Amino acid sequence: MASGKTTGKTDAPAPVIKLGGPKPPKVGSSGNASWFQALKAKKLNSPPPKFEGSGVPDNENLKLSQQHGYWRRQARYKPGKGGKKSVPDAWYFYYTGTGPAADLNWGDSQDGIVWVSAKGADTKSRSNQGTRDPDKFDQYPLRFSDGGPDGNFRWDFIPINRGRSGRSTAASSAASSRAPSRDGSRGRRSGAEDDLIARAAKIIQDQQKKGSRITKAKADEMAHRRYCKRTIPPGYKVDQVFGPRTKGKEGNFGDDKMNEEGIKDGRVIAMLNLVPSSHACLFGSRVTPKLQPDGLHLRFEFTTVVSRDDPQFDNYVKICDQCVDGVGTRPKDDEPRPKSRPNSRPATRTSSPAPRQQRQKKEKKSKKQDDEVDKALTSDEERNNAQLEFDDEPKVINWGDSALGENEL
């Protein structure tokens, strides 16, 4: 199915899309966190960020004169054997006169601080925007209308037009910027450094543990209902539900890795964000009915457009390159997982031939062999490790919580 509607070519500039959703409150908060999500360096020891534009995140609630502040470096670590391990730095934005460097004037030199301002901003003024209380307000997604950071940095894509339930507080009850629930913000903060592809699989596992476990009968029903209504249950391969992958015709999406892992492949969850809903498919498609000997065939042609300035544009392109006509291939960065702990049970009579009647010498296990067995991971340990992968690996695709849409799961 191809995926809004196609339009003719034009030389006119691309339209500016005005995004809705939660906005930073107009009145300052008593918290101490940045209003915005972090910029994340792609490599260790990356230089401070440089910006194509002003470097000030979009916030339409502030006057132009107030559009100035600083980016502050935050060292990050992940746990590991023998202690913590450094991962690439994060940079957080604060308005002048707020945050950890509230005592500095705009432009004062200090290590780990990068000052930015919009054209026409009054950098001698100090902001009354305050900082964020994480218990009341969620992070606001970064948007740069005049150009973002250089290629050494990235940020997780969080859409701001996805409806979520709000948390009623005195500070936000009268504002249109009511924040998502505390549980939602806690989940984003605690997993902000995890690889999103791994987190996609973890969310499915967590949902099953919390009472939404799919029974064998339910999974079988999901996989064998009417073809156009099927969904892939956990533990099923793609071809078990939708048939073998092909090239150049229907059923051409998915490489061998995706076929084997099914819904556990985080790329599936990410791409579901681009798939039209049933209503969008029906009312936003070009519908072509055709009578055939076996019945009525309905063809739906729908086009989903991912803007080139979307922070995840390159990632979506990469997945399409891997998975469209991807049968017989695997991602280049798909490394084999560690083997599970070998089963040390002795063979039973039913599983092995009777031994010869001779005395066998006992093999003495070396200490090195014992150590290797101890270091082998159980399947549970492998799964936990996969959930703890951080975004400092150069080939890891990071999606942001937006890739894990509630409706798609």
From Swiss-Prot:
UniProtKB keywords: ADP-ribosylation, Disulfide bond, Host Golgi apparatus, Phosphoprotein, Ribonucleoprotein, RNA-binding, Transcription, Transcription regulation, Viral nucleoprotein, Virion
Region (Disordered): 1-32, 44-63, 120-145, 164-193, 326-409
Stretches with biased composition (Low complexity): 15-31, 164-179
Residue ranges occupied by any CoV N NTD domain in the UniProt entry: 31-156
Major location (coarse): virion
Compositional bias of kind Basic and acidic residues: 180-192, 368-384
InterPro entries referenced in this protein's UniProt entry, alphabetically: N_prot_C_CoV (IPR044344), N_prot_N_CoV (IPR044345), NCAP_gCoV (IPR042547), Nucleocap_CoV (IPR001218), Nucleocapsid_C (IPR037179), Nucleocapsid_N (IPR037195)
Keyword Phosphoprotein found: yes
Extent of Basic residues compositional bias: 358-367
Region feature (RNA-binding): 29-160
Stretches for region Dimerization: 226-333
Its biological purpose: Packages the positive strand viral genome RNA into a helical ribonucleocapsid (RNP) and plays a fundamental role during virion assembly through its interactions with the viral genome and membrane protein M. Plays an important role in enhancing the efficiency of subgenomic viral RNA transcription as well as viral replication.
UniProt protein name: Nucleoprotein
Native organism: Avian infectious bronchitis virus (strain H120) (IBV)
Highest classification ranks of the organism: Viruses, Riboviria, Orthornavirae, Pisuviricota, Pisoniviricetes
